[in-house]
């Protein structure tokens, strides 16, 4: 009636699979004990050892599942005739899969009890601001609380994003009740409080950014130790001047997009520092500066800075 249109940038998947953590998130937890490492790696070790022995694990790792909507011909054949995985070709695929998982595990990609889901603000607070004109809306979620329907009320959740360079392990309390389920329960998003600094810690906005939400008692305990006295980093980022759009400006923008934003050298330097036997206050300060440089580099094509 009003000639309005809506555009979906990203659509939430019907099925969200379990995720793997990465080395950047693990390297900032610098005081893990050998016993804790053994517990954290247990799921990945069991998964690797069960390839070819456990039917369900084997099929899942080969992508032969009902929720895989884009199966290859090989996967379709296995769905029709599962015994095919005993064929020589299938055995070769399993060997390569196992080799890949071992390589990933050595590189810090470990199986965890978590998944990636969209980040969303407290939309109840947004409605208070938008429709009621409240300049400081209260919302439903308090500071330190999140809502994610895939977890129970009272669960402690680690909320993580990549790139993860500084110590960015916010642990939040999941809150669920009838009122919260009514307002937030239609999606699998993780909803964050408008009173919380979590958006500053993780450097996210709400235009399709995703978060790795983990429920793990050991990782949570380690993270709490390492997050003691850690406050969010804050720095003013430069902004590009406004220009009239023309072919030349569009061309220069595309050129910048393909030639800027190489954060690899910066993040590699951060990893080298975290790899030291003992992390001193001076090294933490250097990591803070490099983290800022990394974020400036990521947005350099937009800000025309650096």
Predicted regions span which residues?
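Short active-site loop/helix that positions an aromatic residue
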Residues: 200-202, 213-229
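Conserved small-residue
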Residues: 1-201, 221, 240-306
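Short, conserved aromatic-histidine micro-motifs
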Residues: 226-245
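Short hydrophobic-aromatic micro-motifs
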Residues: 158-160, 211-214
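Feature representing long, continuous alpha-helical segments
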Residues: 212, 232-235, 292
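Short beta-strand elements
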Residues: 131-132, 210, 216
């Amino acid at each position: 009636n009003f000639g309005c249109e809506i555009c979906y940038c990203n659509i939430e998947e019907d099925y969200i699979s379990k995720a793997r953590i990465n080395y950047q998130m693990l390297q900032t937890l610098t005081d893990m004990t050998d016993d804790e490492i053994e517990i954290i790696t247990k799921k990945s070790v069991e998964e690797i050892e069960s390839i070819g022995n456990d039917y369900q694990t084997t099929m899942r790792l080969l992508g032969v599942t009902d929720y895989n909507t884009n199966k290859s011909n090989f996967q379709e054949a296995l769905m029709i005739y599962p015994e095919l995985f005993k064929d020589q070709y299938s055995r070769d695929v399993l060997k390569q899969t196992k080799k890949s998982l071992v390589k990933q595990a050595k590189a810090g990609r470990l199986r965890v009890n978590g998944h990636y889901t969209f980040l969303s603000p407290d939309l109840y607070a947004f409605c208070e601001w938008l429709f009621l004109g409240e300049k400081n809306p209260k919302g439903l979620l308090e500071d330190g609380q999140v809502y994610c329907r895939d977890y129970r009320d009272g669960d402690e959740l680690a909320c993580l994003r990549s790139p993860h360079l500084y110590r960015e392990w916010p642990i939040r309390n999941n809150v669920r009740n009838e009122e919260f389920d009514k307002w937030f329960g239609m999606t699998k998003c993780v909803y964050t409080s408008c009173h919380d600094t979590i958006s500053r810690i993780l450097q996210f906005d709400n235009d399709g950014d995703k978060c790795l939400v983990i429920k793990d008692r050991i990782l949570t305990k380690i993270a709490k130790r390492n997050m003691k006295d850690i406050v969010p980093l804050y720095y003013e980022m430069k902004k590009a001047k406004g220009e009239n759009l023309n072919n030349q400006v569009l061309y220069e923008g595309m050129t910048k997009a393909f030639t800027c934003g190489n954060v690899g050298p910066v993040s590699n330097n951060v990893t080298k520092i975290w790899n030291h036997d003992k992390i001193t206050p001076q090294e933490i300060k250097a990591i803070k500066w490099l983290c800022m440089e990394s974020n400036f580099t990521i947005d350099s094509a937009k800000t025309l800075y650096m």
